[in-house]
Amino acid sequence: MSGLDDRKKLTHAKNRKPLNDIPKSAENRPNTRSTSSRRGAEKDVPITFIGSSRTVKADLPEFTNTRSRRPLHSESKKELSRNPVSRGEEHSSSLPKSSPESSVSVMSSNASLWSACTEEVNKIGVCAKRESRNLRVYKMKSFTSNMEQILSNDNQLAPTVIRILNSRNSWCLNSCHACLTFIMENITSDNYGKRSACLKALASITNSLLDTIIGFASTKTRRIGVDVVAEERAAKATECIHNFRKIVKNRDKIYKQIDQETIYKLDAILERLKKVSSHK
């Protein structure tokens, strides 16, 4: 058994390579180190930009990645207790300080506005008094038959009468005959109130009263006896038809003196007045 052991030792010694036979590639292989040790050994390389001077890292300001922290509620209370400022003082400090000159100018502007308002109120009061007077006169004299004479004596009463008749839609042959001349004259008026009232009156007359007027004008008187009322109605109706024909005849002249809105309203009225032009 000892002989066998000796033989195995000899064969093992023969197969064993000497230390000099280690390949050179292993010797020339670079000695590797850990990443952390290499990172520590590297030096800080300064960054150079084109057109700017070299700066060392120490010269640059240090920035931190930490976000700005909001102050706590307790800290804000402490700060308020240290510097107590009342709300009234803050409000007074924020308001601009007014100089005496600016206060004088504000007072003068307020006074001018107040005087303008007073003047307008006085004008409204004068108009209201005139309207109330016209209404009283109309109520006292509306049942009389001589309305033409009343309107001819008091020209300011005609607009009030026309507005009342428009609101009540109570136009008749007598009121049409009394107001039609005033309506024709004020269709082209610069006063918007008069112009609109006259247009509304003419539209109301042509809508509800035109056929009645044509009928009164075409009635024939009796051969035996005299009907005074029928003759008066026929005469008034004939005069109204004559005035209607004047409006149709002077259409182009009227159009040159009114605006577009009034032209649209007058077109509808003239369309209804075609019946008058065909009537003999």
Swiss-Prot record:
Predominant cellular place of this UniProt entry's protein: cytoplasm
Compositional bias segments (type: Low complexity): 93-104
UniProt keyword Cytoplasm present: yes
Any Gene Ontology CC annotation: katanin complex
Keyword terms: Cell cycle, Cell division, Cytoplasm, Cytoskeleton, Meiosis, Microtubule
Lineage top rank: taxon: Eukaryota
Ranges annotated as biased composition (Basic and acidic residues): 72-92
Listed GO biological process terms: cell division; embryo development ending in birth or egg hatching; meiotic spindle disassembly; meiotic spindle organization; microtubule depolymerization
Subcellular location: Cytoplasm, Cytoskeleton, Spindle pole
Start and end residues of each stretch annotated as Disordered: 1-104
Function, in words: Forms a heterodimeric complex in conjunction with mei-1 which severs microtubules in vitro in an ATP-dependent manner. This activity may promote rapid reorganization of cellular microtubule arrays. May act to target mei-1 within the cell. Required specifically for meiotic spindle formation in the female germline.
Subunit comment: Interacts with mei-1.
Protein name stated in the entry: Meiotic spindle formation protein 2
The gene coding this protein: mei-2
